[in-house]
């Protein structure tokens, strides 16, 4: 914990030497939404990430920023569970419809859209909105969980464990119509999705991954191959044949809980700091990042203020490295090296010394 906070402070201290030229136009959308699951507090994730210095960090990287603020979602007073199990379906459906409109507007305006969650059910809206302008997009899903249960296979009833099932075309004959979900148009196919960091996959999800040949890299795969090879294979799969926009959906619980304790479903044995930032640095290097979700930061689940701040600060590092922050430090964009003001300056200095 203390080590991760120190690393973050070191990176932050290097930023004043960062790029002096703007390289990205970034829209920031706060999505303070928690009804994709049952734990309170994840709706405060956007505020925590902002307070950790996100906008300042992006600005120091030279990004042009359009801040959409934090969205205010429609309240649904009577939202009975679907099938006596799936909670808050109408709230989730309506909120994602509203979010999709904002993401669509940001992307159509030429911005790379960063959505701050909020729980991971929000990916229904972010990917849907993104796909309206980039129907050929691909998705890199960094998470401890596969989040591909259907409303008929879920055990928890939480929609934050189901978002991808509503988006994948080939799954639609297995997905019932939930109230509030009629607006969704499935926009993904299995070859356009890669998972990184899985370590808590339910039996039905594993069946889906295998049946539809969805590429995934579990933590065991990362241990076996190394994160460099994982990223090489990810890019070969998604952008090897043709370049297309990347949607990065990053759940903070992909990291080991020692680094990101303030989250709702932590699982031991997660990504290290170096592995997590290598993922985002490599995605940035493609020049194809078009939208990014950073979800599941829950300050209320921290056991101390330091844990809450460390988790939010880690989220900022993930986003900043997606837009050009490098661990070797920032680099001023030099056009030329300075020269002495006159050709005799060195001779004059020598005379003074004599």
Curated annotation (Swiss-Prot):
Q: Which Gene Ontology cellular-component terms appear in the entry?
A: cytoplasm; mitochondrion
Q: Give binding positions for Mn(2+) 1.
A: 120, 143, 147, 251
- Binding, Mn(2+) 2: 143, 145, 251, 253
What is the role of the protein in this entry?
Answer: May play a role in the regulation of extra-urea cycle arginine metabolism and also in down-regulation of nitric oxide synthesis. Extrahepatic arginase functions to regulate L-arginine bioavailability to nitric oxid synthase (NOS). Arginine metabolism is a critical regulator of innate and adaptive immune responses. Seems to be involved in negative regulation of the survival capacity of activated T cells. May suppress inflammation-related signaling in asthmatic airway epithelium. May play a role in promoting prenatal immune suppression.
Which keywords fit this entry according to its UniProt record? Adaptive immunity, Arginine metabolism, Hydrolase, Immunity, Innate immunity, Manganese, Metal-binding, Mitochondrion, Transit peptide, Urea cycle
Q: Which family does it belong to?
A: Belongs to the arginase family.
Q: Which residues cross the membrane?
A: none
- Which gene holds the coding sequence for this protein? Arg2
Protein's cellular compartments:
Mitochondrion
Per UniProt, the transit peptide runs over 1-22
Q: Which organism is it from?
A: Rattus norvegicus (Rat)
Q: What is this protein called?
A: Arginase-2, mitochondrial
One Pfam entry for this protein is Arginase
């Amino acid at each position: 914990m203390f080590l991760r906070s120190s690393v973050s402070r070191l990176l932050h201290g290097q930023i004043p030497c960062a790029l002096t030229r703007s390289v990205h136009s970034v829209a920031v959308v706060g999505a303070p939404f928690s009804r994709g699951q049952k734990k309170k507090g994840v709706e405060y994730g956007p505020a925590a990430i902002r307070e950790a210095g996100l906008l300042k960090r992006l600005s120091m990287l030279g990004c042009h920023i359009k801040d959409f603020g934090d969205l205010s979602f429609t309240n649904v007073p009577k939202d009975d569970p679907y099938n006596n199990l799936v909670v808050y379906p109408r709230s989730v459906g309506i909120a994602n419809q509203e979010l999709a409109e904002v993401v669509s507007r940001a992307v159509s305006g030429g911005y790379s859209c960063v959505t701050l969650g909020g729980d991971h059910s929000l990916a229904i809206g972010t990917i849907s909105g993104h796909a309206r302008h980039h129907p050929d997009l691909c998705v890199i899903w960094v998470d401890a969980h596969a989040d591909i249960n259907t409303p008929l296979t879920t055990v928890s009833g939480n929609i934050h464990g189901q978002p991808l099932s509503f988006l994948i075309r080939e799954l639609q004959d297995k997905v019932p119509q939930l109230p509030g979900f009629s607006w969704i148009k499935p926009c993904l196919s299995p070859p356009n999705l890669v998972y990184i960091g899985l370590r808590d996959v339910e039996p039905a999800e594993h069946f889906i991954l295998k049946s539809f040949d969805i590429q995934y890299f579990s933590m065991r795969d990362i241990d076996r191959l190394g994160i460099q090879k994982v990223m090489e294979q990810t890019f070969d799969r998604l952008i090897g044949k043709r370049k297309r926009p990347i949607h990065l959906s990053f759940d903070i619980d992909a990291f080991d809980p020692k680094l990101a304790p303030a989250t709702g479903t932590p699982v031991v044995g997660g990504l290290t700091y170096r592995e997590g930032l290598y993922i985002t640095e490599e995605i940035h290097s493609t020049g194809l990042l078009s939208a990014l979700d950073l979800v599941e930061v829950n300050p209320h689940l921290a056991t101390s203020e330091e844990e809450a701040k460390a988790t939010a600060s880690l989220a900022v590092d993930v986003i900043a490295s997606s837009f050009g922050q490098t661990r070797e430090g920032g680099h001023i964009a030099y056009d030329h090296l300075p020269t002495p003001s006159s050709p005799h300056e060195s001779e004059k200095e020598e005379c003074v010394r004599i």
